[in-house]
Design a protein with these regions (language model features):
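Alpha-helical tetratricopeptide repeat
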Residues: 1-170
Length: 170
């Protein structure tokens, strides 16, 4: 709830910093991350909006806003953010992973597979990309290949299924 968020000591401290200096980009970004980690996506997006307004080339903030928008179901806006992050930093593994999730949620399975493949080339142990690619492969008709990716991802992180369910992906 909004009240428990306001009582969170980290959020309180960051909010005080932002009140003292509304352009404290690092406090805005950090508070956005905390909001996102607590499932307060609208508040996270607002803080990432402010971070990006101050620093339009902040690829981390663009990626985090992409991810938060994806989980919140704002898929077109999310895709724009991920594309911009990747334009500014090609092969940015976090943005490839996030864009894979956008494409998976929007039903663009071939694009999702391409993004997850690219992310896994950079970091072969990226569980979210492995699991996402498995789901995308299954939805694209490659049931056995998909099942293998999913099994490997679950072996690396048994919580991956719950994590994706929390993103609205089953």
């Amino acid at each position: 709830t909004q009240d428990s968020l306001a009582d969170d000591p980290t959020i309180k401290s960051l909010t005080a910093k932002i009140a003292a200096n509304p352009d404290d980009v690092s406090a805005l970004y950090r508070r956005g991350q905390v909001y996102a980690s607590k499932g307060a996506y609208a508040l996270a997006i607002r803080d990432f909006d402010d971070t990006i307004r101050i620093n339009p080339k902040d690829v981390e903030a663009l990626n985090n806003r992409c991810w938060a928008r994806t989980v919140a179901g704002e898929l077109q806006a999310a895709l724009r953010d991920c594309n911009e992050a990747l334009r500014l930093r090609p092969n940015f593994v976090d943005a490839l992973d996030s864009r894979g999730l956008v494409n998976l949620k929007s039903g663009a399975t071939k694009n999702a597979i391409a993004d997850f493949d690219a992310a896994l080339k950079v970091n072969p142990r990226l569980t979210s990309s492995l699991y996402g690619r498995g789901l995308a492969k299954q939805r694209n008709g490659a049931a056995q290949e998909g099942a293998l990716d999913i099994a490997n991802a679950k072996a690396m992180d048994p919580n991956i299924v719950r994590e994706f369910e929390s993103y609205g992906v089953r």
